[in-house]
Amino acid sequence: MEGPEIKAVEAVIDNGSFGRRTVRFETGRLARQADGAVAAYLDDDSMVLSTTTAGSSPKENYDFFPLTVDVEEKMYAAGKIPGSFFRREGRPSSEAILACRIIDRPLRPLFPHTLRNEVQVVETVLAVNPEDSYDVLALNAASASTLISGLPFTGPVGGVRLALIDGQWVAFPRWSERERAVFEIVVAGRVVESGDVAIAMIEAGAGKNAWNLIYDEGQQKPDEEVVAGGLEAAKPFIKVLCDAQNELKRLAAKETREFTLFPEYTDDLYNRIDEIAHADLDEALSIAEKLPRQERIAEIKQRVKDTLSVEFTDMDEMEKDKEIGNAFKELQRQIVRRRILTQDYRIDGRGLRDIRTLSAEIDVVPRVHGSALFQRGETQILGITTLNMLKMEQQIDALSGPTTKRYMHNYEMPPYSTGETGRVGSPKRREIGHGALAEKAIVPVLPSREEFPYAIRQVSEAIGSNGSTSMGSVCASTLSLLAAGVPLKAPVAGIAMGLVSGDVDGQHIYKTLTDILGAEDAFGDMDFKVAGTADFITALQLDTKLDGIPADVLAGALKQAHEARKTILEVINECIDGPAEMSPFAPRIITTTVPVDKIGEVIGPKGKMINQIQEDTGAEIAIEDDGTVYISSEGGEAAEKAKQIIDEIANPHVPQAGETYKGTVVKTTSFGAFVNLTPGIDGLLHISQIRNLADGQRIDAVEDVLKEGDSVEVVVQGVDDRGKISLAIPGFENQENNAGGRRSDDRPRRDDRRHSDDRRRDDRPRRRSDDRDRDYDDRPRRRRDYDDDRDYDDRPRRRSHRDYDDDRDYDDRPRRSDRRRDYDDDRPRRRRNDDRNPRYVADENYDEYREGREVRHERPRRRVRRDFDPFDD
């Protein structure tokens, strides 16, 4: 489909030796009724459709901007059918929710915060290359569709993912390239009037193989300086993407519509509240503890409402209450920010770089595999670790990327953590995002599957919240994992950094805060979370309320966060300086390897062998395709026993004559019992030997003495050339195994019976026809005598028993339907066999039939000669 209404632009991303990537924006073809619709392509191989639509009227009683971002993952985009019961897409995956968050965070600050019309951005993933991620492409598509929609949006926003591979920052890296990435960073920003790029969002983390790449291959560590360099490296790519979107706006943008904006309060109301409450609020905002401070602020707010109830009588009461609340909150914000900018004074009296009181404790919950409590000020995080077999790792039905996850981090924040009530249940987007960030911080220091073959689930319970629960989760997870015996390569700690900016004496300044409170997060301009070891950064996240933040300000915040991180790591090391002994309630997992060609023997037909081992030992067994075997049990003894059995199967010991075994009867027959000696090796205990268990008495059946599952002590009597094992009861090794007095191994073979010993089986006379002198193939054919000179194929064909004229074609014989008698229409039809079988006679004629005819089953049955030979001449 082509036409003048279709507009398209391209942005070329040059990665040097890693090649080029092309991002193309197209509008006018799809979703024409949406306010803005853009299809974004990455190398014409991945495709995301972005639509932006605004409600026609403002939402009533909303005191915030109602922006929603949804990502629709279509499994057909990857050539898959959904694995759910209904075989269709359902609730969004965690990957889709995380993509929603990285789109929402840079877009929201670029709308007027007083807009009350609902705005919805929908990203539909239509096609995706398995080597690419769609999230950053969707971010650029969302910015483009919003830019041309006619909404009051001060974009565009450009987004790029960079990976540090072999010392080079690569944009839009493929999954195969990301395997060698030391660090990955997603940066979104906008181009300001000066031409520089202001950063609006960061989502970053060290690669899963970063530790090995750094310490084994000598790759560059992603410390504060390197990460700051990554922010600078992202700017040219962001500028190229923003330029392409601006060109699309020039070609296809709608005119900006007029929307009603709803000021949160009037200036007169704000000034009056400032007169009444400024001094009291200034004092209340110096109370260090959260709950007493909130109680005091609530008292002041109520006094303000009482004072203003007789004033501003021309306002609606509901509107007046809303505006008083908004103006009162803005006054608090201005007081807190002004003190920080002019006095370096924070709410709880700390300096800009000070950290709240820290405490750490392990083993706080009984019976769990690992637990810890980390506290920073009034923020409390309870970390719980659970270990299990690798088969319990999470299976991910994703469009691209990894399909399994060995380390699963879940973050939960119940409403009581802030002293409130609310819904408890399935996780919200914020909880999923915080869990993913904490998971990203821990993954680079986890031991490998070979070093620690466990699936690990980490749960962070935010039981008390007053700022930075996500970074508190990182600290609690480190403590809990070490307490569970997980050999982390290094401890990890996290800290949340804040920012306050403003004009002081005609100069715009930035103040960076270490370890922000919840109120400082709400009243500040930035929430900058940084996690890492003592040597490098493992995770990073930036949210901001500003249009963008200069990169040098963020670089300074990274260095300030490093100082705080080292302080927290000292507290962690004082609590636990290495992995503890594993809990007695945790499963013990050991590994062994078997040759690939022996995997089938270990598993057995339909899993019989492996199930039997698990049943006998109580251990759980998982086998990888490469022959690695993971064995788990609550106690180490069961796992060791299962390992011994598996090793015997993989490297079997062939029983030798004279060896004694304690075996198990696995099968009984009329001539004896098969006894399992070692896994996969059975021997035959002859019935003549089984009599010895019955004091030599004759037995009618083997089952009278031995049954399947019985244990019996046996000795190997002999092993023949075919590997068949003969068994005996200890003390009766020399007893013959048959009634004829000969040893079973000495009995003649079937081939040798009734023939002289020097004659081979193949030398015995063949069964021939009566004519011994005639060649075998010249024997007369069965049933018919043919002339010897007549070809076999000339014999008469088998015909019907009817006689046909020779000159009549065979197919001209009368059909069965033609041989039927012609009946008058009034004549009743004969039922099948009605003259012999009364079951087919109509009910009304049945009595008459019984009187006049003989019932079939009363007749004598016809006898058949059993000695009749149809071929006997």
Curated annotation (Swiss-Prot):
UniProt KW Isomerase keyword: no
Organism: Bifidobacterium animalis subsp. lactis (strain AD011)
Function recorded in the entry: Involved in mRNA degradation. Catalyzes the phosphorolysis of single-stranded polyribonucleotides processively in the 3'- to 5'-direction.
GO biological process: mRNA catabolic process; RNA processing
S1 motif domain ranges (all copies): 658-730
Subcellular location: Cytoplasm
Enzyme class name: transferase
Sequence ranges of Basic and acidic residues compositional bias: 742-857
SUPFAM superfamilies listed in its UniProt record: Eukaryotic type KH-domain (KH-domain type I) (SSF54791), Nucleic acid-binding proteins (SSF50249), Polynucleotide phosphorylase/guanosine pentaphosphate synthase (PNPase/GPSI), domain 3 (SSF46915), Ribonuclease PH domain 2-like (SSF55666), Ribosomal protein S5 domain 2-like (SSF54211)
PROSITE patterns in the cross-refs: KH_TYPE_1, S1
Single Gene Ontology MF annotation: 3'-5'-RNA exonuclease activity
Disordered: region residues: 727-873
KH domain location: 587-646
Keyword line: Cytoplasm, Magnesium, Metal-binding, Nucleotidyltransferase, RNA-binding, Transferase
Signal peptide as annotated in the record: none
Major localization listed first in the record, in broad terms: cytoplasm
One GO cellular component term noted in the UniProt record for this chain: cytosol
Protein name: Polyribonucleotide nucleotidyltransferase
Gene3D superfamilies xrefs: GHMP Kinase, N-terminal domain (3.30.230.70), K Homology domain, type 1 (3.30.1370.10), Nucleic acid-binding proteins (2.40.50.140)
Residues noted as binding Mg(2+) in the record, renumbered to the chain: D521, D527
Listed PANTHER family: POLYRIBONUCLEOTIDE NUCLEOTIDYLTRANSFERASE, POLYRIBONUCLEOTIDE NUCLEOTIDYLTRANSFERASE 1, MITOCHONDRIAL
Reaction(s) this enzyme catalyzes, per UniProt: RNA(n+1) + phosphate = RNA(n) + a ribonucleoside 5'-diphosphate
EC assignment: 2.7.7.8
Family: Belongs to the polyribonucleotide nucleotidyltransferase family.
Annotated InterPro entries: ExoRNase_PH_dom1, ExoRNase_PH_dom2_sf, GPSI/PNP, KH_dom, KH_dom_type_1, KH_dom_type_1_sf, NA-bd_OB-fold, PNPase
Cofactor: Mg(2+)
